[in-house]
């Protein structure tokens, strides 16, 4: 079982840790976070307001901003995912989850984290800060063998499970798991393109609030309206998720682009893919091929539903993407709007774990 370190114990760092314990596929041995103490880590891991109390191997965590007690708190309690249903505590300077002790670091400089001493072979870079090959590569200096960036990267190879993961080569030391939205869009786009051909398309993601947004109106380093209060507004925003599909499906490069609407919900987002098809297809034909993919090569990653679902129905869902057969529409046999849901936190975190497992299988 591959031994994993987590850098940054924020939303994705904690949920990757949860996903790791739930799946039993990887061993978390260390965590780094300079802003959270150990007891707070325990709390934050165990209680999650969205996903509930923790139910799950991780060997090290780094977060320079959280002391150990705070780590305990943040892991235990989560406003989105609910209280952690296992045991989590701080003991002898370590974070102990279900009896499994995890080494804690609080380094701001990733090159100073002694991942090797903790036994961490793979590092999940989940701070959102060290997203380039050069910056993420600092983890290798501390003894890590490979780094998985849990965000899009300007220059690291990007992989989406079920889409292009088979192209991973063990010579690669640093990779990106792309974004949650790319992980939702790419499997659906692949199925549609493989069966009917996508001439061109526009994507819109209606996206839940994330930690980068403001609780009340404040200054934004990007677009001014990005600084509007997240709970008060629907905010048009940019996203590179659709263009990134062209990196994982080269045949679609230059054929897709998109935007986002940030909406005041805590979790779960939805993709609207409006595209022109090369081959004619009835909407029932599209439903059929998507369902076949869900039951076949994309099982566990792409889901399918004909129920009258809403966003909260997907809270805690581990799929990358769930096609909503009843929500899509067709103007004609060549022009369609397709809808797919995703838990932008938990579904994505499960794919981070799956990517590490796949990489380890190539060692």
Swiss-Prot record:
Region (Interaction with WARS): 1-176
List of residues that carry Phosphoserine: 150, 176, 179, 269, 340, 361
Residues spanning the signal sequence: none
Residues binding NAD(+), per UniProt: 11-12, 33, 108, 150, 344
Active-site positions on this chain: 180 (nucleophile)
EC number: 1.2.1.12, 2.6.99.-
Deamidated asparagine modification, residue list: 7, 92, 98, 177, 183, 253, 344
Keyword Transcription regulation belongs to the record: no
SMART domains: Gp_dh_N (SM00846)
Summary of activators and inhibitors of this protein: Glyceraldehyde-3-phosphate dehydrogenase activity is inhibited by fumarate, via the formation of S-(2-succinyl)cysteine residues.
Pathway: Carbohydrate degradation; glycolysis; pyruvate from D-glyceraldehyde 3-phosphate: step 1/5
CDD domains (alphabetical): GAPDH_I_C, GAPDH_I_N
S-nitrosocysteine, modified sites: 180, 275
UniProt site positions, description: Activates thiol group during catalysis: 207
Chain positions found as Phosphotyrosine: 70
Family affiliation: Belongs to the glyceraldehyde-3-phosphate dehydrogenase family.
PANTHER family to which the protein is assigned, alphabetical: GLYCERALDEHYDE 3-PHOSPHATE DEHYDROGENASE, GLYCERALDEHYDE-3-PHOSPHATE DEHYDROGENASE
Functional note: Has both glyceraldehyde-3-phosphate dehydrogenase and nitrosylase activities, thereby playing a role in glycolysis and nuclear functions, respectively. Glyceraldehyde-3-phosphate dehydrogenase is a key enzyme in glycolysis that catalyzes the first step of the pathway by converting D-glyceraldehyde 3-phosphate (G3P) into 3-phospho-D-glyceroyl phosphate. Modulates the organization and assembly of the cytoskeleton. Facilitates the CHP1-dependent microtubule and membrane associations through its ability to stimulate the binding of CHP1 to microtubules.
Oligomeric form and interacting partners: Homotetramer. Interacts with TPPP; the interaction is direct. Interacts (when S-nitrosylated) with SIAH1; leading to nuclear translocation. Interacts with RILPL1/GOSPEL, leading to prevent the interaction between GAPDH and SIAH1 and prevent nuclear translocation. Interacts with CHP1; the interaction increases the binding of CHP1 with microtubules. Associates with microtubules. Interacts with EIF1AD, USP25, PRKCI and WARS1. Interacts with phosphorylated RPL13A; inhibited by oxidatively-modified low-densitity lipoprotein (LDL(ox)). Component of the GAIT complex.
Protein name, as recorded: Glyceraldehyde-3-phosphate dehydrogenase, muscle
